[in-house]
Amino acid sequence: MTESGRIPLWLVATVAGMGVITLLGIFFYGAYAGLGSAV
């Protein structure tokens, strides 16, 4: 792989994937917590 001062694609994909998983986790946790407290 030739790096020309750019951010590696795998690093971008990893950070983006972790961000999406974190957002999904927070969203589902918030929905579950809200559901549990509402019932």
Curated annotation (Swiss-Prot):
GO terms of biological process kind: photosynthesis
Its primary localisation, in coarse terms, equals membrane
Q: Which SUPFAM superfamilies match?
A: Photosystem II reaction center protein J, PsbJ
Q: Record's Pfam families? A: PsbJ
What keywords would UniProt list here?
A: Membrane, Photosynthesis, Photosystem II, Reaction center, Thylakoid, Transmembrane, Transmembrane helix
Residues annotated as transmembrane: 7-27
Please give an example of a GO cellular component term from this record: plasma membrane-derived thylakoid membrane
Localisation per UniProt entry: Cellular thylakoid membrane
Q: Does the keyword Thylakoid apply?
A: yes
Topology in the lipid bilayer: Single-pass membrane protein
Q: Cite the record's note on assembly.
A: PSII is composed of 1 copy each of membrane proteins PsbA, PsbB, PsbC, PsbD, PsbE, PsbF, PsbH, PsbI, PsbJ, PsbK, PsbL, PsbM, PsbT, PsbX, PsbY, PsbZ, Psb30/Ycf12, peripheral proteins PsbO, CyanoQ (PsbQ), PsbU, PsbV and a large number of cofactors. It forms dimeric complexes.
So what family is this one in?
Answer: Belongs to the PsbJ family.
Biological function? One of the components of the core complex of photosystem II (PSII). PSII is a light-driven water:plastoquinone oxidoreductase that uses light energy to abstract electrons from H(2)O, generating O(2) and a proton gradient subsequently used for ATP formation. It consists of a core antenna complex that captures photons, and an electron transfer chain that converts photonic excitation into a charge separation.
Q: What is this protein called?
A: Photosystem II reaction center protein J
